[in-house]
Amino acid sequence: MKFPKLRKRTVYWAVLTVFALFTIHFVFQYKEHNSHRVQPIVLIPKAFPSLILNSFDTQNEELVPIKLLKNCQIIRSYHTGYEENTKLLGQEPQSNFHKFNFTVFSSMKPIGLDLKQCQLLSSSSQVEVNDAVNMDASLHDILGKLLQDIRHGKLEYLQEIAPFFLPELQLQLNLNIVDRFWYRFSGSSIWLDQYNMYFMISRIAYSPHGVKNQPVVSLTYGQLFDRNWNEVKNINLLVPSNDPSKNGGHDSFRIISFPYFLPIPFWHDIDNTDGNYFGPEDPRLILVRNKQGYEEPLLIFNSYHRKFVHYDDDEDSIMGQTVKFQRSMFMCWPWQYQMGKSNVEGTSNPEYDNKVYNRVIELKVKLLADMKSQKNWTPFISEDSTNKFDSYIYFVYRWANLDVLKCSLLGDVAGDCVFDYRLDETLVPQNKVGPLRGGTQLVNLRQVIPRSVYHRLLPSHREIFIGFARTHLDNCGCGKVMYRPNLVILVKDAADKTYYKISHISSSLSFDVPIIGWNVYKPDDLCFDSNVLIPYSVSNWNITSLELDIEGGRWVSNDQLTLTLSISDSTVHRLDIRGLFQSILDLADRSLFIPVDRETRVIDEFQNGLQNPGSNPLNQDVNSLGVNNDNIVCALDASVEFCFEYGAKFSIPKQEEFYEVEQQEFNEELIDPKKHQYFKILGKYLYDHASVNS
């Protein structure tokens, strides 16, 4: 009778021993795994308060996510061992530069819009460019991660937008055809000096029919790149932020993991996508300095949204309300947040009120309140304020018949805009802006030229802004439409009032970038439908040297600018340009800078003219100083000629046929068996099933 009992005890102790050994082994393996596990890396800004970082005072939990930081490898961007320890920086890429010539039109000789006299305004310039680099990213990997995050319940924002593309996305991934329905382009980037990183955002658009100019939803994807343009994945930034639960008024820091989809709020109606394009479009980044002294990115975009507008019913004297839909311009702070999205929904909605989104504000101009569509504003920052932070952002609203907007960044009036300058006060603001529009942000030369030299080049009341607008030309000789960059130089002079002028503008610029056809199945057919090369951002502009050559009577510089572009709304490219600042210094009319041989006298004359409105030539004859449209029309005329010559060279002889969407889909399915298989599966197992249960 005791034997069975002993046997049970033996088994009991044997099991207990095995369990104990397994537990010890598991704990040992876990510790061994943790000892080799790489800690998450958090980059902190150079200006981050050392006292907070060193103390890890839990009393600062509202200001800094201390608990998260304790589990991370913390690195300042300028850490001496940064490159060796993290291996984030690659080798300097080898680039082949070649000379590129282009024509620039000045504004100093009035020609009365006579195109026959454009040669009086034209001069030749030269820079060096390298081969454009395709900053390709695997859409399969990006969207695979997106699907994984949605399934794991990560981020409420992703759950909200998932019905736009689920369950179709899973099938697209299985068949490896996501690039037939998803498109990544509109890459815009800025250099974050506090982190020694490039911050890039790009637009990822989804078209259920696979027609790239008819996406139902657009998302914004954020990435980080090191100084040599190697993407840095699985890294975190500690950024200055706000507390959305306290109405944005509480300063704090937040950790953002890269890469990621920015949770930008937008109004949408998933059940009504026909003809509606939801989400942020044409994103542009620009750097601003906030009231706390930190530089942070600001994102400019346009988006379709809903408003509830009050109106007066004259019959019963009761205020009524109607729904209004329009496409408007917005500002987004990627490092700041808000609760809910009533500012894009038009009203409070319990479904979204407790969700966290990026902070956005609509840009509003009273004179333009009734316009159904606003887009293609060109942003820039002026340093005319005595504050140490940016209170306003400026926009070129219209290039031809120049209009400049000034919009507040701060307080309750953030987003309110007024016209800071109008070339033609009689022009109705709602008039079409013309073929020259949008493009990159404009770079203030004060942010590029060393402070020690700036006052020797420009009087204190002048600012110069450089960027690349884009020309939109219809039926000019190559397909239905052509887009190309144009170099633009905007000058701001402060006299008794503020004056702006487009001092110089180039014709269309190819930068010798090879174009791919709009139709992905016919990439060599360059003049089918659209021929597109669009500039999106000046990522960086570095002047490595700037010296005065007294004997030669000129300034000599070395500089390099990085430009991002998109080809055929399908790519994100970057291009390096050397010598652009030197070409601007050497412009034939010498109207921008103080002449070397007359430095002191010119400064005195210019300053006196600004301080004495009666003697200021701007008040006497603005046309004589180039405040006109002469160089604009000359540049556009040259751009049309560029398009015509391009079409003559690259058009494939055939009868033009522009199909409707249904016909285009049918033709592509014949060419692409996988796409045909995809729609066949959807029709059999998804759409038919859905219709039965509807």
Curated annotation (Swiss-Prot):
It is a single-pass type II membrane protein. It is found in: Membrane. InterPro entries: BMT1 (IPR021988). Glycans are attached at residues 101, 542. Beta-mannosyltransferase involved in cell wall biosynthesis through beta-1,2-mannosylation of cell wall phosphopeptidomannan. Plays a role in the ability to produce hyphae in the presence of three bacterial species. GO terms for molecular function: mannosyltransferase activity. This is Beta-mannosyltransferase 8. The chain crosses the membrane at residues 12-29. One of its GO terms (cellular component) is membrane. It comes from the Eukaryota. Its main location: membrane. Residues 1-11 are cytoplasmic. Disruption phenotype: Leads to a hypo-filamentous phenotype. Keywords: Cell wall biogenesis/degradation, Glycoprotein, Glycosyltransferase, Membrane, Signal-anchor, Transferase, Transmembrane, Transmembrane helix. Residues 30-694 are extracellular. Belongs to the BMT family. Its EC number is 2.4.1.-. The gene is BMT8. It is an enzyme of class 2 (transferase). GO terms for biological process: cell wall organization; filamentous growth.
